[in-house]
A protein has these predicted regions:
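Histidine-anchored nucleotide/phosphate-binding helix
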Residues: 29
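Aromatic- and Gly/Pro-rich donor/ligand-binding loops
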Residues: 14
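Glycine/alanine-rich phosphate-binding loops at beta-alpha junctions
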Residues: 1-3
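Single, function-defining residue in the core of a domain
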Residues: 6-11, 22-24, 33-154
């Protein structure tokens, strides 16, 4: 019921991993409303806090998809943990948009050239934003997507 009311605007979903019980980790998907993250779906596994397998992220997309009202516009905000190509593909198949911060250790291809993101980062000054429209990420060339590289101190 709440999601149906929130879905009149773009639904913003965020991902969070946290300790759950004794020796467990919960990977949670929240819907953001009025600056608060409201739990929507989660999967729990044994282990320590850290990166979860891509299959868990995909399971979370499938759980969330069943709860999202048909026709809702969804944007998922995530970190590098959910940037695997299978995970991105599952969100794309669900019709969701993706905003994901990823590490500079990867590769991208754009306009026929292969780029190491780390090298792009070295070449731009702090405060500069470089846009690569219709880029592809990883060796598998997942895309097209809009790749933004931001120069920062540190």
């Amino acid at each position: 019921m709440l999601l149906a009311h929130l879905a009149v605007q773009t639904l913003v979903l965020v991902i969070d991993g946290s300790v759950g019980g004794r020796g467990g980790v919960a990977l949670m998907r929240h819907v953001v409303d009025k600056g608060r993250a409201l739990p929507l779906a989660w999967v729990v596994r044994r282990g320590k806090k850290g990166q979860c397998p891509e299959a868990l992220h995909i399971a979370l997309v499938e759980q969330g998809q069943a709860l999202i009202p048909p026709g809702a516009r969804v944007v998922v905000l995530g970190e590098g943990e959910g940037d695997g190509t299978d995970c991105q593909h599952s969100r794309q198949e669900a019709g969701w948009f993706d905003v994901c911060r990823t590490g500079s250790h990867g590769t991208a291809s754009w306009d026929g050239a292969t780029l190491r993101l780390e090298t792009v980062g070295w070449c731009i000054t702090p405060g500069t934003l470089v846009e690569f429209p219709s880029a592809a990420l990883t060796r598998e060339a997942y895309g097209p997507l809009l790749l933004l590289c931001c120069g920062a101190n540190g």
